[in-house]
Amino acid sequence: MKPGIHPDYREVVFQDMSNGFKFITRSTIQTRETIEHEGKTYPLAKIEVSSESHSFYTGQQKIMDTAGRVEKFKNKFGARANGKAAAK
């Protein structure tokens, strides 16, 4: 392997932001934050979903608020969206 061209492969703590679950694995991800875990400092990568919170693995469903998304879009961008569509 050529020196200096490969990313740093190191232990990183991934934290599930939906439930606070943390796990250590090896990764090349670049992060600015660090965390103290078991007396050692590791880079911290924050993630939205992990196997601890995903409905496929937990067997529980989370209800997402998707109702009214089209209406919100129309209220926010209605005039501009209609104007651009007509101009084409």
From Swiss-Prot:
One of its GO terms (biological process) is translation. Keywords: Ribonucleoprotein, Ribosomal protein. InterPro entries: Ribosomal_bL28/bL31-like_sf, Ribosomal_bL31, Ribosomal_bL31_B, Ribosomal_bL31_sf. GO terms for cellular component: ribonucleoprotein complex; ribosome. Belongs to the bacterial ribosomal protein bL31 family. Type B subfamily. It comes from Burkholderia cenocepacia (strain HI2424). Part of the 50S ribosomal subunit. This is Large ribosomal subunit protein bL31B. The gene is rpmE2. One of its GO terms (molecular function) is structural constituent of ribosome. The keyword Ribosomal protein applies.
